[in-house]
């Protein structure tokens, strides 16, 4: 895909408006799979793209799957729908209660985490769904440094500040929607208000902001996780280590992350444009990337699976009108590329 500026990508997107009902459904289905898979995969969820697709579209689990990962993916999709519906009610301001409700829906319930300390002793603590953290949290960076987030004591006030700032900034219109989303994301991450699920909530709220301003929702791809984290780290170097400074950072201070975020939005928006406008029977889309097959039979099999996730070889043979040996070869190649899952 050729490089486009954010402005040109948005212009191309605007030209497609209003979308037909069919295009809206196609885009929504694709985004649902891509967003949930990637946002959870970044955090260690082990479901494959194909398993995620079948789970979210058909409510079925194919192959071996971790029970908690299945539950997390399902809850993620419920939370995505909740966020999407709320974002459309533009007269309603963002509230900390809504953010905490999102978190409760995402985590579903309280649960206990068990860990082994360096001295060999066992420890445990409870993760509270929908409640701010009760213990300090931090991360070890790729450079080996410990990076502290806001303390439990200062978190409620910082979250209130963040939401109040956002609602006021939205009214004033000082920032573009993309700048507003990037700055909110960075400030939120520097607070890290919950003991788990902060990254997933941040990516949901980014799309909440974009949707409120009539921008298409975006996906932070798991395969680009290192670029995402490096952009946050580069901004941290400008802002400094004090959590409250990060929670009130300026757009100028986080410019490495803003630049990254603008490139991300441009790429994702233009990918949507291509997805809706490029029509070829040999073409398929997989996790935000265009796949061009040598034969249309590959994409025909994948299209069949969009309506029926569990197909027999005989059914495929009947639909394609080719011999069984050719069917098996096509299916094996699609499985080897992980475009379809082995049941």
Task: Outline where the language-model segments fall.
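FIC/Doc superfamily catalytic core
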Residues: 1-196, 200-343
